[in-house]
Regions:
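N-terminal beta1-alpha1 cap of cysteine-dependent amidohydrolase-like domains
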Residues: 1-96, 100, 107, 111-114, ...
Length: 140
């Protein structure tokens, strides 16, 4: 049976509209089709703690925490993603963090985050320094 993966979405304000919108870069569809063609994936709306019922209903098998938005800049997204992470940890589900998503995992593990300049960070390759010991983040 194909795995079902949820991908979190950033929050943006569309030009000309005074309303926040959940969104996901369009290249995610191509990326997922290339790296995991037999996986069903779905974007996850920012619902805060209500996301727990949503993912339970869809019986998702894991989560990708996507990039966009700084931690702490969107309370609803923060609540959604920490709820998802706690659900994943309770149910031994795999998680993967991209940019902000990796920062979320690092913060949850009480790791160090260093602020970087946007023009140096966005759409650029940058180093990630790992500790020498193994951290089994999602171990049951």
């Amino acid at each position: 049976m194909a795995k079902r993966i949820g991908i979190t979405m950033r929050v943006d304000n569309a030009s000309g509209h005074n309303e926040p919108r959940d969104c996901l870069a369009q290249d995610w569809a191509n990326y997922m089709a290339n790296v995991s063609p037999n996986t069903f994936w779905m974007p996850l709306p920012n619902l805060g703690e209500a996301i727990a019922d949503y993912v339970q209903h869809w019986q998702l098998d894991g989560f990708i925490f996507s990039g966009g938005n700084d931690l702490g800049s969107c309370q609803l997204r923060d609540s959604t993603e920490f709820t998802l992470l706690n659900h994943a940890l309770r149910n031994a589900l795999p998680v993967f963090g991209v940019c902000r998503g990796l920062q979320l995992l690092q913060q949850h593990a009480n790791g160090f985050l260093r602020q970087c300049e946007r023009d140096v960070h966005v759409a650029n390759v940058h180093p990630i320094h790992l500790r020498t010991d193994l951290l089994e983040f999602n171990a049951p």
